[in-house]
A protein has these predicted regions:
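Interhelical loop/hinge segments that connect adjacent transmembrane helices in multipass membrane
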Residues: 1-9, 185-189, 201-243, 247, ...
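Primarily residues marking transmembrane-helix entry/exit sites
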Residues: 5-13, 47, 123-127, 220-228, ...
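Membrane-interface helix-capping segments at transmembrane helix termini in multi-pass transporters
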Residues: 7, 38-46, 78-88, 99-137, ...
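Signature of the first transmembrane helix
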Residues: 7-73, 102-108, 132, 167, ...
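Membrane-interface junctions at transmembrane-helix termini in multi-pass inner-membrane proteins
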Residues: 10, 137-162, 177, 186, ...
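Hydrophobic alpha-helical transmembrane segments
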Residues: 20, 127, 131, 161-209, ...
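Membrane-helix boundary and inter-helical linker elements of multi-pass secondary transporters
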Residues: 36, 152-153, 180-181, 251
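Helix-loop junctions and terminal segments of transmembrane helices
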Residues: 61-77, 152-153, 211, 268-286
Length: 286
């Protein structure tokens, strides 16, 4: 049992490190290509939209973290009945979260073009960028979110990391091709949306093949994830600390300033994440 856990932990470390190296390499290249091909306004728009969507993640209300913590015990002891009950409770909340997330994305798609001006980008294009950027998040909550939590609790973070790396590489190469062919920011985000929806489908397929014992009709154990209210307080403070700066720049300084700022912030964030991966207990817990 300990050797299996160590093997999973090592796999998480190796795949996590490789993912970070790929992310750093392509994360530097792609924004530069967007800047040279579409301009700083387009790059700033993408950064601003991502920050808005980060705030929508608060709709989860800490359910994800609370559910994963609740799953560690039953997964370790092999109590499938308890796992199914926790998963059923998580699904109930995630389904509601997905509905409100989708509604919020639609509202943002309608409002964001009215509050942000981008030179060379029409309001309808801004709306589509918001829609294509946010749709995968809604689908994630509706169909995949609870499945990812079980993989993490089961020490199989490397599965998600490998899939995330492949998805990121495909998305990045597709962006390079689309930019070379002269497509705009809307087409880039439409492609991003399509690739991420395929990723969600792959996770669902993986879970169907390897976790056939999951019972969607199990009696929900809401008490097991009752600590979500305590978790959300920490998530709010972290989100405000990490994401407020870009939104303030968006509304008061314009998208061109956002583009410059996020380039430096991105590099700092990559280095911070890379260092954090070595000290994080996630590699041991999965």
């Amino acid at each position: 049992m300990n050797s299996l856990k160590a093997k999973k932990g090592l796999g998480n470390i190796v795949t996590g490190l490789f993912n970070q190296l790929v992310t750093i390499a392509l994360g530097i290249l792609i924004p530069r290509l967007i800047l040279t091909s579409l301009g700083s306004e387009a790059n700033g728009l993408l950064s601003s939209v991502n920050q808005v969507l980060a705030y929508l993640a608060l709709l989860e209300a800490g359910i994800g973290t609370a559910s994963m913590q609740a799953l560690y015990g039953p997964v370790a002891t092999g109590d499938r009945n308890a796992v199914n009950r926790i998963m059923a409770a998580t699904h109930h909340f995630y389904r509601r979260t997905g509905f409100f997330y989708l509604l919020a994305v639609l509202v943002c798609a309608a409002v964001f073009p009215l509050t942000v001006r981008a030179e060379g980008i029409a309001p309808w294009q801004i709306a589509l960028v918001v829609l294509f950027s946010g749709l995968p998040g809604a689908v994630n909550y509706l169909f995949q979110g609870k499945l990812r939590l079980l993989l993490l609790a089961d020490g199989k973070k490397y599965v998600l990391t490998n899939l995330g790396t492949v998805t990121f590489v495909i998305t990045s190469l597709s962006k390079i091709l689309l930019l070379h062919l002269g497509f705009g920011v809307v087409e880039l985000q439409a492609m991003y949306c399509a690739v991420n929806l395929l990723q969600i489908g792959f996770v669902c397929l993986y879970m169907y093949r390897h976790y056939r014992w999951l019972d969607a009709k199990a009696q929900p154990d809401y008490a097991a994830i009752s600590q979500s209210r305590n978790v959300v307080i920490h998530e709010v403070s972290t989100l405000i600390f990490n994401n407020t700066d870009t939104l303030i720049l968006t509304w008061f300084c314009g998208l061109a300033s956002v583009s410059v700022y996020t380039m430096y912030a991105m590099l700092f964030g990559m280095v911070t994440t890379l260092i954090g991966n070595f000290s994080s207990a996630n590699f041991i817990l999965g």
